[in-house]
Amino acid sequence: MPAAGSEPSRPPSPPGVQEQSAEPRPPPPPHGELQYLGQIEHILRCGFRRDDRTGTGTLSVFGMQARYNLRDEFPLLTTKRVFWKGVLEELLWFIKGSTNAKELSSKGVKIWDANGSRDFLDGLGFSDRAEGDLGPVYGFQWRHFGAEYKDMDSEYSGQGVDQLQKVIDTIKTNPNDRRIILCAWNPKDLPLMALPPCHALCQFYVVNGELSCQLYQRSGDMGLGVPFNIASYALLTYMIAHITDLKPGDFVHTLGDAHIYLNHIEPLKTQALMELRGQSSRSLDGDGQAGTSRWAPVATDTERDRCCELQREPRPFPKLKILRKVETIDDFQAEDFQIEGYNPNPTIKMEMAV
């Protein structure tokens, strides 16, 4: 018997068996892509039917936000293959200040071809503009905000405000500034643009040696555009962090009109969720106003919770490596970037609404 007041000795734990911790290890954070898939599901369930500029028709909600971690991963979506070369080449084209769609097309990236076509430009009243000349779109606003736009071949060096360089300089000299903003929305130039900016404004934020970015996107095509935009602004954050000796932090994506084109509904069901089993896939209830209608699945909330399951599980996000030390934003080349571990689900074909 042990002496009064003494504690009986316990035999040592067998090898390999550890004492149970008083504080269990927290579960890993959910996959970042689930935010995007949740947005798709929410629009399919709750979106309003709205007409749009292209005549295609959309399901739309107003106001959404997601936050993507950039520290050890790169948010290139995995539930479908995202056109990484297109993301990279388009961003380099923006940084160059180019407004020539043919320049991008010559690199095999044809995402601006339709908006720069002869028919499209003529339809906007730009019949005197050369084919491929998009007007003062993103790159021009980033590098020459306020300059007078003539055409895609004119020289604009030293004209207007180089917002992108000003962002970089401010991050280096005054990282606590709350005005580190890059804006593509220029009301004076909107009538000259083949397409007004969808991703209109981004703000950068520095804390604890990390650079984060928040994008305000006035119009988000959830099927085609948004996966591209997530990767593009994540890449821009990596690039600016690299040349300012910071580490990437978060990318915060704020959407205004977040919409699914009606001809993208079935492809996105393949990507995001399964149809409600035994139910009509959709029903418009007619309660909308001014030509709008609410998207209303027939199933109850309980049935939706049971029946809506992920059709494609997200896979681990890849990593992005910058292969050499680059000193200025204009020195980046496509060969400087390497995506590692990208193993997405197959491509899902969707037609672009023009």
From Swiss-Prot:
Keywords: Cytoplasm, Isopeptide bond, Membrane, Methyltransferase, Mitochondrion, Mitochondrion inner membrane, Nucleotide biosynthesis, Nucleus, Phosphoprotein, Transferase, Ubl conjugation
Its EC number(s): 2.1.1.45
Subcellular location: Nucleus; Cytoplasm; Mitochondrion; Mitochondrion matrix
Chief subcellular location: nucleus
GO cellular component: cytoplasm; cytosol; mitochondrial inner membrane; mitochondrial matrix; mitochondrion; nucleus
Taxonomic superkingdom: Eukaryota
MF term (GO), any: thymidylate synthase activity
Pathways involved: Pyrimidine metabolism; dTTP biosynthesis
Active site per UniProt: 198 (nucleophile)
UniProt keyword annotation of Signal present: no
Entry keyword annotation includes Zinc-finger: no
Role description: Catalyzes the reductive methylation of 2'-deoxyuridine 5'-monophosphate (dUMP) to thymidine 5'-monophosphate (dTMP), using the cosubstrate, 5,10- methylenetetrahydrofolate (CH2H4folate) as a 1-carbon donor and reductant and contributes to the de novo mitochondrial thymidylate biosynthesis pathway.
Protein name as catalogued: Thymidylate synthase
Lineage: Eukaryota, Metazoa, Chordata, Craniata, Vertebrata
Gene that produces this protein: TYMS
